[in-house]
Amino acid sequence: MSLLQFSGLFVVWLLCTLFIATLTWFEFRRMRFNFNVFFSLLFLLTFFFGFPLTSVLVFRFDVGVAPPEILLQALLSAGCFYAVYYVTYKTRLRKRVADVPRRPLFTMNRVETNLTWVILMGIALVSVGIFFMHNGFLLFRLNSYSQIFSSEVSGVALKRFFYFFIPAMLVVYFLRQDSKAWLFFLVSTVAFGLLTYMIVGGTRANIIIAFAIFLFIGIIRGWISLWMLAAAGVLGIVGMFWLALKRYGMNVSGDEAFYTFLYLTRDTFSPWENLALLLQNYDNIDFQGLAPIVRDFYVFIPSWLWPGRPSMVLNSANYFTWEVLNNHSGLAISPTLIGSLVVMGGALFIPLGAIVVGLIIKWFDWLYELGNRETNRYKAAILHSFCFGAIFNMIVLAREGLDSFVSRVVFFIVVFGACLMIAKLLYWLFESAGLIHKRTKSSLRTQVEG
């Protein structure tokens, strides 16, 4: 890449970054937090944060990258995607009408809410316990990270339930919403994330997500400022780099350490070059249509229920890894959101996907506002826990693609909804057995005096 070509790419990158950052800043000033702000920051991180890192790798370490015209296509496709997404998100689908009291779809009380978070936590802890009994601490047993996807590891399906510890702790926080509950959320979820990091053998997702949710709650409540958020972001990047070194068993120093930091940070937070690789092989792609979305559900179907289930699921990430890159190392390489749309339907699917994503984020914001207006604090805690708990799925949306997001968000909704139903059923059984007594002011006064 020549200096002139880099200058052209830099101008496009700067314009796109300023465009998205400006819109995000205005939205932040208006709302402080909503899921449009979160997705916009996530989109910036995924598709634009990596460009400076790539530039340093090219000019400092002479690393080979896709041709400049392909990198330009990747930057422009990301900028155009966001423009269509933003217009869709801001488009009002129906006229604003005065709030009319409606019969709520469901209600929650104190016992049901506490039962819900206990069940969610129980699912996570039991899954971790069973996985540990089968495999032990994989971080200290395996020689390479790719081995966690091999037949040596049993009970892999249980990992999908680990994440429900975070929604459980979110319910606990939203029931109190004070600084002590906020700090308890951080300590409990990060400790659980470190435990799963050692047991699973290097998966950092739970730690990243817990830390991100903690920061956004702090921003919403005004407990941390923007400069503190920036400092925490830098600390998070350094922390993820250190965990990556431990995961891959690397011991580096000097120039090698700087080089390793650049490419690991880029691959962890901003895999935008994967989109460029996909566009570089555009003519070799056999468009998959909506099949990757359907195929991604296969992993949630037990083999005993479907004996003939394909062992290798050809979703967009695996298609990109196996068919486009001809990489069979055992690791799936993230195609990114835009890359998954290209795999499914080419360039035409990029604006269509942007419209779909705009509607998805609009729905989450509607649900979040519903929780903000809710007068029943127990129901509000459940709604907020569901919304913030879905942040993991939004990260999957930006990094892995639309197909992975759809399967995971459906799984999340089903499990979360099942926990609600079980909690309500248990409450009904306890109430029928006379085990639940309503609190009265006189009983509370007696407890205080005693």
UniProtKB/Swiss-Prot annotation:
Its assembly, as annotated, is: Probably part of a complex composed of WzxE, WzyE and WzzE.
What is the name of the protein in this document?
Probable ECA polymerase
Query: Keywords assigned by UniProt?
Result: Cell inner membrane, Cell membrane, Membrane, Transmembrane, Transmembrane helix
- One GO BP: enterobacterial common antigen biosynthetic process
Q: Does the keyword Transmembrane helix apply?
A: yes
Q: Which residues cross the membrane?
A: 6-26, 37-57, 63-83, 118-138, 155-175, 181-201, 207-227, 228-248, 341-361, 378-398, 410-430
Spell out the GO cellular component terms annotated for this protein, sorted alphabetically and separated by semicolons.
plasma membrane
Extract the Pfam families matched here: WzyE (PF06899)
Pathway of this protein? Bacterial outer membrane biogenesis; enterobacterial common antigen biosynthesis
